[in-house]
Regions:
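M16 family metallopeptidases and their MPP-like homologs
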Residues: 15-17, 23-43, 60-116, 152-175, ...
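Short, polar/flexible loop-turn hinges at active-site or ligand-entry regions and domain interfaces
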Residues: 53-56, 98-101, 120-129
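Compact, aliphatic and Gly/Pro-tolerant "microcore" segments centered on a short helix or tight beta-hairpin
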Residues: 126-194
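A common structural junction motif
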Residues: 112-123, 220-229
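His/Glu-rich zincin catalytic helix
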Residues: 1-73, 176, 189-257
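Acidic/histidine-enriched alpha-helical segments
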Residues: 64-65, 120-144, 232-240
Length: 257
């Protein structure tokens, strides 16, 4: 089978990479949005909060138990930067159907679980749980601060911040600490709803299942995905190189031991 890609819902694209040589199959669901300073931290925080539980599995213990029933299926969060785009969502992996002891079909429940985590997260009073948001905020801020503690990562980030100061590419995939610290469960929920309704969703499957079956599984799993006015991603910008190079020197204490 050849690679398959098409728009299966408004602003939702499915790519299937047929592969029968692996013992596992994977399904990723990632929203692709513009990388900018105001939204980067919100986007980075969102999948971490969504991974804490759903209305049916309201905590990580219940969610983990549900994955265990699917031969130890794993669902991990992903936050990455691709050029001037930020991609956030989940990547799920499970054993391929061919290796299920009882001949179970695992693609459908795996897709359903990913869809449930994105579309039916645990809420209270119409918003994400405050304790989950605050907990994941601490983790996000710790991750942002950790970059400074790794001198190589910090040097690379500072290079991009200075070299691409006027460009989206200069924004960290995790956003900045100041913005992250101001996020609340109310503002994050509103941001999440906007992303669900207008963001471009990229679904990628790699495994041995037939294309028609994969398409049917994800259409069912994401049938409740709200689709409003699509966010039109701006074209990649090209900036002319400056006529003269800039030299910037920063000093930092380094301890060895």
């Amino acid at each position: 089978m050849m690679e398959f890609r098409r728009e299966i819902m408004r602003h939702v694209y499915l790519t299937v990479l047929p592969a029968s040589k692996f013992k596992t199959s994977c399904l990723s669901a990632q929203f692709v949005t513009e990388l900018d300073r105001e939204r980067a931290a919100y986007n980075a925080l969102l999948p971490a909060v969504l991974s804490r539980g759903t209305m049916r599995y309201p905590d990580m213990e219940a969610l983990s138990a549900a994955m265990d029933t699917l031969y130890g299926t794993t669902v991990t969060t992903t936050v990455r930067k691709n050029g001037e785009r930020q991609c956030v969502g989940f990547v799920a992996s499970c054993i391929d159907d061919r290796f299920a002891l009882g001949g179970e079909k695992l693609l459908e429940p795996m897709a359903a679980l990913v869809g449930e985590m994105l579309l039916d997260p645990v809420t209270q009073g119409g918003h994400y749980l405050r304790e989950y948001v605050e907990s994941e905020k601490v983790n996000l801020i710790d991750s942002i601060r950790a970059i400074r503690n790794d001198k190589r990562d910090w040097a690379n980030l500072r290079l991009l911040q200075e070299m691409c100061a006027a460009e989206p590419y200069g924004v960290s995939r995790l956003g900045d600490e100041e913005t992250a610290g101001k996020i609340t469960n109310h503002t994050l929920f509103r941001h999440g709803q906007r992303l669900l309704s207008s963001g471009r969703l990229e679904l990628l499957y790699c495994g041995s299942a037939e294309v028609s079956r994969v398409e049917e599984a994800v259409l069912q799993a994401f049938s409740t995905l709200p689709r409003g006015s699509a966010e039109e991603l701006p074209p990649m910008q090209t900036f002319a190189a400056p006529e003269k190079p800039r030299f910037i020197t920063e000093e930092m204490d380094v301890t060895q031991g």
